[in-house]
From Swiss-Prot:
Protein name in the entry: DNA ligase
Any one GO MF annotation of this record: DNA binding
Gene source species: Rubrobacter xylanophilus (strain DSM 9941 / JCM 11954 / NBRC 16129 / PRD-1)
Coiled-coil regions listed: none
Function as written in the Swiss-Prot or TrEMBL entry: DNA ligase that catalyzes the formation of phosphodiester linkages between 5'-phosphoryl and 3'-hydroxyl groups in double-stranded DNA using NAD as a coenzyme and as the energy source for the reaction. It is essential for DNA replication and repair of damaged DNA.
Gene: ligA
Length: 685
């Protein structure tokens, strides 16, 4: 469609309601048109000054005639008042995750499976579509009669969170669709941040003395999940759409759906249609070479069967469709100088060496810090302070130093030595025999206390909306909280005067803290931050014992009778509940009404029913997601390898668990092997 007529740069203000209504509609139409040209098509037709004049006139008219303000007006993108909590949204069509391929051979194997399942009669009709796998936050947009009525996060694929007001603030998300869309249409896509915007955002945070975000994905996800949509509106978010949920039946193919989305005024992921797998593989290779030139973060190429009818015939396994696969790129790497090694203290007292680097650009992100894991890792790799080193970054994984470049040494390099005293509290540290981690044993160490509060409020534990790291640090530094029990003694009037909060946000935070009392005991147990006790282990223990029983004294022998709880975990639990400081904390939490009752176990059956699996190393998706898949298939995830372990799922850098599995003869699976078990293509041995 052509551009609507531009107004005068200094327009007269309409005085009559009827005249104002007509002018408001004209302005909204013009602004939507130019939003599409600028944010979707990247082809602006007017100057910023001209656009600002349109916007100012609309603001002035809506101010004079507030009855003309509508939720889908361009002026309403600023966000509105904060929410008290996110409401759940059940996806009518599940937002499935994808199988992964890391080698070309795996793409060919997938192609062969697709052809085998479709049969020879479909050979001539089979087409593939490739599109970039953007590293952001997956969301869905529901339009009814062309108007945006709801936006939601992917969540677990079946239930997400309602983030409509947050997504409305994104300029590339239109409130109304062009052309003639179906009555119900649910485009799906990835919210992300361009690399240059990410760098600028972090630069400003550092100037204000705030901690920078680790990567663009974390910033995008955190921005959308802000209870206050005004915060979202200030973040430089954009979106690419890659598919359709509800309403997909209106299209014959994926490529047809993408073309329609573009016609409706939505930003569509760059994509190509292919006639065979060789062409797909060539395209993956081209993007692998070009990815560092892109202005957004990608971690692979998604390959999809184009025909909707063929997709339906292929179906899905567990949480992944058979008709799509993600080809993952190799991790990005850069070369820089290791200036220093500093030591940080975590919530369990673990001292972790961290590399201080000369800033280096890796995949469009400037990296100045990277993990060195532990003292043994540094020695095994032969890393010296002052070395030239190779740094890798894969997806949202923390950057890591993978090796030094010894040939570039000049003799001024120094060996790293782990400090003998905690760098925060000054107490002596120790490294237990057989462990790789040096620890501060002072339970009153401020660094441990703060990290414990941050962990307690996290989504996997008590999920306290609005209590992020920044606010937790501020409350801790002001002396308002010293441990997690103090959270339940906070009052809104204490919080409201704090910079960046205010009365409404303070009340919302207090409500969120109160709601955390409803979390089941396994979440509380995980939130306590006991060494070796992850979310899966906490669930196993909480199914057998209550908090009161653990306080009274449950022995190592009783705990190890729980399937999946080994001696190391059991001793850690017993030690935790034997320390008077911890017992006082648990008693206070009980007095505040938190849930310490046992959790009823869930009967499970599936292809991994009765099997015990351990996960180790870096995987292509979050470990919690892998655990969910295993447990959804009837399996149990445990934390340590023993003779009772049926499988070890090993990613990159698997560590000592892989050696232990080999010693005991435990079968080792990569992600593809696990996928075959989950899908039923292979039966457990």
């Amino acid at each position: 469609m052509g551009a609507p007529t531009l107004p005068r740069i200094i327009p007269p203000v309409a005085e009559k309601l009827a005249e104002a209504r007509q002018r408001v509609e004209e302005l909204r139409e013009q602004i939507r048109y130019h939003n599409r040209k600028y944010y979707v098509e990247d082809a602006p037709e007017i100057s910023d000054a001209e656009y600002d004049a349109l916007y100012r006139e609309l603001e002035e008219l809506e101010s004079r005639f507030p009855e003309l303000v509508t939720p889908d007006s361009p002026t309403q993108r600023v966000g509105g008042e904060p929410l008290e909590e996110f409401e759940e949204v059940r996806h009518a069509v599940p937002m499935l995750s994808l199988q992964n391929a890391r080698r070309v051979e795996e793409l060919r194997e997938w192609d062969a499976r697709v052809r085998r399942l479709l049969g020879p009669e479909e050979e001539g009709r089979l087409r593939y579509v490739t599109e970039l796998k953007i590293d952001g936050l997956a969301v869905s947009l529901r339009y009814e009669n062309g108007r945006l009525v709801r936006g939601a996060t992917r969540g677990n694929g079946f239930v997400g969170e309602d983030v409509t007001r947050q997504l409305r603030t994104i300029r590339s998300v239109p409130d109304r669709l062009d052309d003639d869309p179906p009555g119900v249409l649910e485009p799906r896509g990835e919210v992300y941040i361009k690399l240059k915007d990410f760098e600028e955002f972090n630069r400003r945070r550092q100037e204000r003395g705030e901690r920078p975000f680790a990567n663009p994905r974390n910033l995008a996800a955190g921005s959308v999940r802000q209870l206050d949509p005004r915060v979202t509106a200030r973040r430089p978010l954009t979106i690419y759409l890659y598919g359709v949920g509800e309403g997909y039946e209106n299209f014959e193919s994926h490529s047809e759906a993408l073309a329609a989305l573009r016609r409706y005024g939505l930003r569509v992921n760059p994509h190509t249609v292919h006639g065979d797998i060789d062409s797909v593989i060539e395209e993956c290779g081209r993007w692998a070479k070009k990815r560092e030139a892109l202005d957004f973060q990608v971690d692979g190429v998604v390959v999809k069967v184009d025909s909707r009818e063929q997709q339906e015939r292929l179906g899905a396994v567990q949480k992944a469709p058979r008709w799509a696969i993600a080809y993952k790129f190799e991790p990005l790497a850069g070369r820089t100088r290791l200036r220093d090694i500093v030591v940080t203290v975590g919530r369990t007292g673990a001292l972790t060496p961290q590399a201080v680097l000369e800033p280096v650009n890796v995949g469009g992100v400037t990296i100045s810090r990277a993990t060195l894991h532990n003292e043994d890792y540094i020695k095994e790799k032969g890393i010296l302070i002052g070395d030239t080193v190779i740094v890798e970054r894969a997806g949202d994984v923390i950057p890591q130093v993978v090796r030094p470049v010894p040939e570039e040494r000049d003799g001024d390099e120094e060996e790293f030595r782990m400090p003998e005293r905690c760098p925060v509290c000054g107490e002596r540290v120790s490294r237990p025999e057989g462990e790789a981690i040096t620890r501060c044993a002072n339970v009153r160490c401020p660094a441990q206390a703060l990290e414990h509060i941050i962990h307690w409020a996290s989504r996997g534990a008590m999920d306290i909306e609005g209590l992020g790291e920044k606010l937790a640090r501020k409350l801790f530094d002001l002396g308002l909280i010293r441990d997690v029990a103090d959270l339940y003694e906070l009052r809104a009037e204490q919080l409201a005067p704090l910079e960046g909060l205010g009365e409404k946000s303070a009340q919302n935070l207090i409500r969120a803290i109160e709601r955390s009392k409803e979390r089941p005991f396994d979440r509380v147990l995980f939130g306590l931050g006991i060494r070796h006790v992850g979310s899966a282990t906490a669930e196993l223990i909480a199914e057998r014992f209550s908090g009161e029983e653990l306080l009274r004294g449950v022995g190592v022998e009783e705990l190890t009778q729980i399937e999946g709880v080994g001696e190391i975990v059991a001793r850690a639990v017993v030690e935790y509940f034997s320390l008077e400081e911890n017992r006082k904390l648990v008693r206070r939490l009980m007095e505040h009404g938190l849930n310490f009752g046992p959790v009823r176990g869930k009967p499970e059956e599936g292809p991994l029913s009765g099997r015990r699996l351990v996960i180790t190393g870096t995987l292509s998706r979050p470990r919690s997601e892998i655990s969910d898949l295993i447990e959804g298939a009837g399996g149990t995830v445990t934390s340590s390898v023993s003779r009772n372990t049926d499988y070890l799922v090993a990613g990159e850098n698997p560590g000592s668990k892989l050696e232990r599995a080999r010693e005991l003869g435990v079968p080792v699976l990569d992600e593809e092997g696990l996928r075959r078990l989950l899908s039923g293509e292979e039966r457990p041995g």
